[in-house]
Amino acid sequence: MRVLFFVFGVLSLMFTVPPARSFISNDECPSEYYYHCRLKCNADEHAIRYCADFSICCKLKIIEIHGQKKW
């Protein structure tokens, strides 16, 4: 009987707790040219968010060079 109550308690808790990902937020990658939905980002990219199909939205890393160092 206790096991049955435990199972029902766990099931009710699973259905009352909201999911980690909000359905209100935008799950799509922005339509700019440097965003891509992939399963793994390349070495020159970093992850931004999850896409609708649970792939990762990747963006190119912007590396700025601030001139040469002087000794």
UniProtKB/Swiss-Prot annotation:
Annotated disulfide bonds: 29-57, 37-51, 41-58
Localisation per UniProt entry: Secreted
Leader peptide range in chain numbering: 1-22
Source taxon at top rank: Eukaryota
GO biological process: defense response to bacterium; innate immune response
Keyword match Transferase: no
Function text: Has antibacterial activity. Upon stimulation with lipoteichoic acid, promotes cytokines and chemokines production and secretion.
Family under the similarity heading: Belongs to the beta-defensin family.
Record's protein name: Beta-defensin 131A
Native species: Pan troglodytes (Chimpanzee)
